[in-house]
Curated annotation (Swiss-Prot):
Residues 132-229 are annotated as: H3-like. GO terms for molecular function: centromeric DNA binding; protein heterodimerization activity; sequence-specific DNA binding; structural constituent of chromatin. One of its GO terms (biological process) is mitotic cell cycle. This is Histone H3-like centromeric protein CSE4. It is found in: Nucleus; Chromosome, Centromere. Component of centromeric nucleosomes, where DNA is wrapped around a histone octamer core. The octamer contains two molecules each of H2A, H2B, CSE4/CENPA and H4 assembled in one CSE4-H4 heterotetramer and two H2A-H2B heterodimers. Interacts with the inner kinetochore. Interacts with the central kinetochore protein CTF19. Interacts with YTA7. It comes from the Eukaryota. InterPro entries: Histone-fold, Histone_H2A/H2B/H3, Histone_H3/CENP-A. Histone H3-like nucleosomal protein that is specifically found in centromeric nucleosomes. Replaces conventional H3 in the nucleosome core of centromeric chromatin that serves as an assembly site for the inner kinetochore. Required for recruitment and assembly of kinetochore proteins, mitotic progression and chromosome segregation. May serve as an epigenetic mark that propagates centromere identity through replication and cell division. Required for functional chromatin architecture at the yeast 2-micron circle partitioning locus and promotes equal plasmid segregation. A motif (Nuclear localization signal) lies at residues 115-132. Keywords: Centromere, Chromosome, DNA-binding, Nucleosome core, Nucleus, Ubl conjugation. Ubiquitinated. Is degraded through ubiquitin-mediated proteolysis when not protected by its association to the kinetochore. It comes from Saccharomyces cerevisiae (strain ATCC 204508 / S288c). Changing residue 194 to Q: In CSE4-111; impairs nuclear division by disrupting the core centromere structure. The gene is CSE4.
Length: 229
């Protein structure tokens, strides 16, 4: 058994050594081919470089003009430069200084300030209208009429109404005219009658446990008061 194992191990070692030698030979051949290709490529690049030989640009350093010509050219250029500077200074003095250019941010700030001012002006001019309830309005009217003893009906419409009524009850031959004091006395009497009638009507509505005045309340008040009371 030991001799057989030794034979197997020796066979394996010989096989592995043969494989390693073959791999080394193959790698060496590949390296040689790579070196040959690199050398040929290098030679080709050198050959292409030799096709374009370098030439020194001597014309750049050689001057075709003499010293006298250079000096005259320099003097002419200096004179032209002085004339140009004088002309530029005169032109700058003649031209007006332009206004500074306003940037976009400056214009935007100005627009915002203008809109803000307009909004504040509108708010100051706009009146705040307060909404009152019907009960508040009624209380305001009661206090307003209690403070004054003036007539409640306008004078001109009342005078027009009186003339229309008199024209209906008179003929064309009769020419009735009213004095201003007579119309004022008639207006005071009619307003006193209406105010008294409405007071009694309101009392009847409250007696019926109502706030709203109705037609039947006024009819009952007229019946109680009599025809001319």
């Amino acid at each position: 058994m030991s001799s057989k194992q030794q034979w197997v191990s020796s066979a394996i070692q010989s096989d592995s050594s043969g494989r390693s030698l073959s791999n080394v030979n193959r790698l060496a051949g590949d390296q040689q081919s790579i070196n040959d290709r690199a050398l040929s490529l290098l030679q080709r690049t050198r050959a292409t470089k030799n096709l374009f030989p370098r030439r020194e640009e001597r014309r750049r350093y050689e001057s075709s003009k003499s010293d006298l010509d250079i000096e005259t050219d320099y003097e002419d250029q200096a004179g032209n430069l002085e004339i140009e500077t004088e002309n530029e200074e005169e032109a700058e003095m003649e031209t007006e200084v332009p206004a500074p250019v306003r940037t976009h941010s400056y214009a935007l700030d100005r627009y915002v300030r203008q809109k803000r001012r307009e909004k504040q002006r509108k708010q100051s001019l706009k009146r705040v209208e307060k909404k009152y309830t019907p009960s508040e309005l009624a209380l305001y009217e009661i206090r307003k009429y209690q403070r004054s003893t003036d007539l409640l009906i306008s004078k001109i419409p009342f005078a027009r109404l009186v003339k229309e009524v008199t024209d209906e009850f008179t003929t064309k031959d009769q020419d009735l005219r009213w004095q201003s004091m007579a119309i004022m006395a008639l207006q005071e009497a009619s307003e006193a009658y209406l105010v008294g009638l409405l007071e009694h009507t309101n009392l009847l509505a409250l007696h019926a446990k109502r706030i709203t005045i109705m037609k039947k309340d006024m009819q009952l008040a007229r019946r109680i008061r009599g025809q001319f009371i």
